[in-house]
Curated annotation (Swiss-Prot):
Entry function: Catalyzes the reversible conversion of 2-phosphoglycerate (2-PG) into phosphoenolpyruvate (PEP). It is essential for the degradation of carbohydrates via glycolysis.
Residues in coiled coil: none
PANTHER family for the chain: ENOLASE
Protein name as annotated: Enolase
Family (UniProt): Belongs to the enolase family.
Compartments, as annotated in UniProt: Cytoplasm; Secreted; Cell surface
Pathway: Carbohydrate degradation; glycolysis; pyruvate from D-glyceraldehyde 3-phosphate: step 4/5
Cofactor (UniProt): Mg(2+)
Species of the source: Sodalis glossinidius (strain morsitans)
Reactions listed under catalytic activity: (2R)-2-phosphoglycerate = phosphoenolpyruvate + H2O
GO-annotated cellular components: cell surface; extracellular region; phosphopyruvate hydratase complex
Protein residues bound to Mg(2+): D246, E291, D318
UniProt keyword terms in alphabetical order: Cytoplasm, Glycolysis, Lyase, Magnesium, Metal-binding, Secreted
Length: 433
């Protein structure tokens, strides 16, 4: 019933109007899995390769017909008649057939789409929801939790066309008792933030991830606006709602100078100075998590940042670790950061993603399942977060259907699991239990 009989790839459109790869995996019992690969804007240099055509006459060079051809050709041939329930074997077959260190032959976008579609088909053949199947693959059958959301309500950096350098300013509804309540709280703050920004004559157009993207005089001004919105919504900052930031500092790091350049504020910092700039923000506002607070290659700086802030707040590696167990292992050994952002298209298969989650948890690092700035209606990351009991999820703001699709799936899962999937709130955040 779980033997693969057909694999189909196609080119579809993501939330930024760019092509991406969608895959279908059909099983002999009539079961079908459908999945699409996401795409990032600010990407780590060591991510698995997203294969694009480079043909400027189609989609400005961003077409993915080469990756789709890989799905419909060699990948389909290799996986036909294989057992979809053996996820590790399927992923190994594709990785070995690709034969490159970074999946550059077929593209991580091709391999991942098939990997996820196969998992969905297998879960259907077993008559269970995807999150239950993922828990079994993870070796944690029956162990679930609902993730604390990080909601990106002000977008900057590579995710918006504004003057704000820090890429994401997020709220965490830690006072909620359930994911359903967390979503309501996030929505109320989001709408009150629009009122705050409008009252200041600011733009309320949204960025790639559904957050507002106004021009602001400083990063502190973004935090101040959110504080006002939280209070307008009737909540207490630091008790009901905490704050998180994704600096994506690699995007404003000067390779030639080794400095960090906040153009929006007209300020330049050394590595240690920028750590203390962030430290000052954490003293002014209840910021409990900072992601990519330095350039991905500034490991000495990260060691210093971890020494200064690591026992107080969660320090998340995204571009730093790129969901790669080899890099994460080195980070753990050197005491770099204390948390990892999990993006399965950074590594390119479900099996490798689960390995990164396990390694992080075994080392005492927290795990945050994440979307990308280029998304589709595919809500697999919601099931991944619950099925691995990851603890936290980052999937954008309270607008754009590509973002809310994930929140809506979490609401459905919570309804189905009830008390079997506790919502632990702030206890999931490193340094805040």
């Amino acid at each position: 019933m779980s033997k693969i009989v057909k694999v189909i790839g196609r080119e579809i459109i993501d939330s930024r109007g760019n092509p991406t790869v969608e895959a279908e995996v059909h099983l002999e019992g009539g079961f079908v899995g459908l999945a699409a690969a996401p795409s990032g804007a600010s990407t780590g240099s060591r991510e698995a390769l997203e294969l694009r055509d480079g043909d400027k006459s189609r989609f400005l060079g961003k077409g993915v017909t080469k990756a789709v051809d890989a799905v419909n050709g060699p990948i389909a041939q290799a996986l036909t008649c294989k057992d979809a329930k053996d996820q590790a074997a399927l992923d190994k077959t594709m990785i070995d057939l690709d034969g490159t260190e970074n999946k550059s032959k077929f593209g991580a976008n091709a391999i991942l789409a098939v990997s996820l579609a196969a998992a969905k088909a297998a879960s259907a053949s077993k008559g269970m929801p995807l999150y239950e199947h993922i828990a079994e693959l993870n070796g944690t059958a029956g162990k679930f939790s609902m993730p604390l959301p990080m909601m990106n309500i002000i977008n900057g950096g590579e995710h918006a066309d504004n003057n704000v350098d820090i890429q994401e300013f997020m709220i965490q509804p830690v006072g909620a008792k359930s994911i359903k309540e967390a979503v309501r709280m996030g929505s109320e703050v989001f709408h009150n933030l629009a009122k705050v920004l409008k009252s200041k004559g600011m733009n309320t157009a949204v960025g790639d991830e559904g957050g507002y993207a106004p021009n602001l005089e400083s990063n502190a001004a973004a935090l101040a606006a959110i504080k006002e919105a939280v209070e307008k919504a009737g909540y207490m900052l630091g008790k009901d709602i905490t704050l998180a930031m994704d600096c994506a500092a690699s995007e404003f790091f000067g390779e030639a100078t080794g400095n960090y350049n906040l153009k929006g504020e007209g300020k330049t910092f050394t590595s240690q100075e920028f750590t203390h700039y962030l430290e000052d923000l954490t003293k002014q506002y209840p910021i409990v998590s900072i992601e990519d607070g330095l350039n991905e290659s500034d490991w000495d700086g990260f060691a210093y940042q971890t020494k200064v802030l690591g026992d107080k707040i969660q320090l998340v590696g995204d571009d730093l670790f790129v969901t790669n167990t080899k890099i994460l292992k080195e980070g753990i050994e050197k005491g770099i950061a204390n948390s990892i952002l999990i993006k399965f298209n950074q590594i390119g298969s479900l099996t490798e993603t689960l390995a990164a989650i396990k390694m992080a948890k075994d080392a005492g690092y927290t795990t945050i399942i994440s979307h990308r700035s280029g998304e589709t209606e595919d809500a697999t990351i919601a099931d991944l977060a619950v099925g691995t009991a990851a603890g936290q999820i980052k999937t954008g703001s309270m607008s754009r259907s590509d973002r809310v699709a994930k929140y809506n799936q979490l609401i459905r899962i919570e309804e189905a699991l009830g008390d079997r999937a506790p919502f632990n709130g702030l206890r999931e955040v490193k340094g805040q239990a």
